[in-house]
Design a protein with these regions (language model features):
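Helix-biased detector of long, well-ordered alpha-helical tracts
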Residues: 1-329
Length: 329
């Protein structure tokens, strides 16, 4: 569903006031947060994807990492997971289903969470994801809003997985580039979140289906600020930009471009289709975090020490120049 259509649908829903619901659907945040006590709040989220790869085990890993990421984006710790499966039992054998679940379990275990059950339904094609419950202190969770003027923006993973998966279906992506993409997607955002928790972050979101620009726009609007992004600093997966140059795209680019139209300014002309990478839909993408400039280099260094080699400082938070909430320079 398009982000614009989804927003209209959610805005039309009746809203129940509950003082313990600290984060609902009104702010397009990554997960809901519900206070249980003065010390504990639940982080609740669900996500489901179609297979970006043929290998069932890897599909399960990607689907699980993608779902668990929303808890990390809220500053939470994942605790329990439920499998959400759509499966064509007449077309695919039980070994495929088993591979998906086993792959997911490796990531659930790595996240130090537990698999508590799930639900499987008959479907025309495989679909997989998790409903995840996490915990966080009710006064210490992160929002996708609240970025402060003067803060620096760090992105923890490369972008470009959407176009690479489509191009791979056409046999256009070199094996090494495709494997690097998969390695990124099965990497949990656990280490990135653990590093960020050591610093004074003001806003965090994970980059998924709306692309870097779409999720950055949500952060900018929610923060009443403008995010200035350095085009040359944004980490891009090998061959992704090349695929756009060859005319490959995704089914989400058009809707993602519509989301940012009227709110984005490019301060330099981009050749060909190179601007498409910023609306490329991600699966299990990285975290985008705003934190003080005085802390950014140390945070980046700790991420690199933790093996997050793709992490980069990609921009700054500026006073709002609405309607230009995003400025690419």
């Amino acid at each position: 569903m398009s982000p614009v259509g989804l927003d209209k649908l959610l805005q039309a829903l009746p809203k129940k006031v509950d003082p313990n619901l600290l984060v609902g659907f009104e702010t397009s945040d990554d997960a809901g947060v519900y206070r249980l006590t003065d010390e504990v709040a639940l982080v609740v989220t669900a996500d489901i994807i179609t297979p970006p790869v043929d290998d069932p085990f890897v599909f399960g890993q990607i689907g699980a990492a993608n779902s668990i990421s929303d808890v990390y984006a809220m500053g939470g710790r994942p605790v329990t997971c439920l499998n959400l499966l759509g499966f064509p039992t007449k077309e695919l054998g039980p070994e495929v289903l088993q591979g998906i679940v086993e792959g997911a379990l490796t990531k659930i275990t790595e996240a130090e969470a537990v698999l508590a059950g799930g639900h499987t339904t008959e479907d025309e094609e495989p679909k997989f994801g998790l409903a995840v419950t996490g915990v966080v202190h009710p006064e210490k969770f992160w929002h996708n809003k609240g970025a402060r003027q003067g803060d620096v923006l760090i992105l923890t993973k490369r972008i470009g997985s959407g176009v690479l998966f489509n191009a791979n279906l056409k046999g256009l992506v070199p094996e090494a580039a495709m494997q690097a993409c998969i390695d990124s997607l099965i990497t949990l955002n656990k280490s990135a979140a653990e590093v960020l928790q050591q610093f004074d972050v003001s806003a965090v979101t994970d980059i998924t289906g709306f692309g870097l620009a779409g999720h950055a726009l949500e952060m900018a609007k929610g923060s009443d600020a403008t995010l200035e992004l350095d085009i040359d600093a944004i980490p891009v997966m090998a061959e992704a930009a090349n695929m756009y140059d060859k005319g490959v795209t995704t089914g989400s680019n058009l809707n993602n471009r519509a989301l940012i139209t009227g709110h984005t300014r490019f301060d330099r002309e981009l050749p060909g289709n190179s601007g498409e990478i910023f609306v490329d839909p991600q699966t299990s993408g990285g975290l985008l975090a705003a934190l003080p400039e005085s802390q950014a280099q140390e945070a980046l260094g700790r991420m690199h020490d933790a093996g997050l080699d793709a992490a980069r400082i990609i921009g700054h938070v500026l006073p709002s120049s609405a309607p230009d909430y995003l400025v690419f320079k």
